[in-house]
A protein has these predicted regions:
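Membrane-embedded hydrophobic alpha-helical segments
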Residues: 1-4
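Hydrophobic/aromatic-rich structural module bridging two neighboring secondary-structure elements via a short loop
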Residues: 6-10
Length: 141
């Protein structure tokens, strides 16, 4: 039996889901633009705009509203985001190498994003928990 979650929890989960979506979309779909600026100007000034997110300012108290699976999914997703941000801000690699690595990071980030969405949807009751196990297995393969 699924326990009904509070309205505050639903709101927090929706905010986290939307934040992850917007961040992922900026990272993935603006990659050609920010990589062009990086390779042409060797400037890192535009990266804060790409990687800005609300999760960085969420309190532990607010995160306590989330279930364990969602917390694990958030950690996995935002750790990869932070790894990408760190790499782009500190790399000495040549632009072609940077672009290859970023594309690999984006592919991995997409899997983490899909998993996070799955966990949030299950916790919000948008999909049944039994179907989520099947989808998670498919995501891993």
């Amino acid at each position: 039996m699924k326990v009904r979650i509070s309205e505050n929890t639903q709101r927090m989960l929706m905010l986290l889901k939307l934040d992850a979506r917007r961040l992922f979309e900026r990272i993935k779909y603006r990659a050609p633009e920010y990589m062009y600026d990086f390779s042409l100007k060797r400037s890192r000034d535009h990266f804060p705009e790409i990687f800005t997110n609300r999760y960085d300012s969420v309190s532990i108290k607010d995160l306590l509203l989330c279930g364990q699976e969602v917390l694990a999914g958030l950690d996995q997703f935002y750790t990869k985001v932070d790894e990408m941000r760190w790499y782009l801000n500190h790399t000495q690699d040549m632009p072609n190498r940077v672009e290859d690595k970023i594309h690999a990071h984006i592919r991995e980030l997409e899997k983490f994003y899909e998993t996070l969405n799955l966990y949030i949807d299950v916790e919000m009751g948008l999909i049944a928990e039994s179907s989520s196990a099947t989808e998670a297995d498919e995501t891993d393969n």
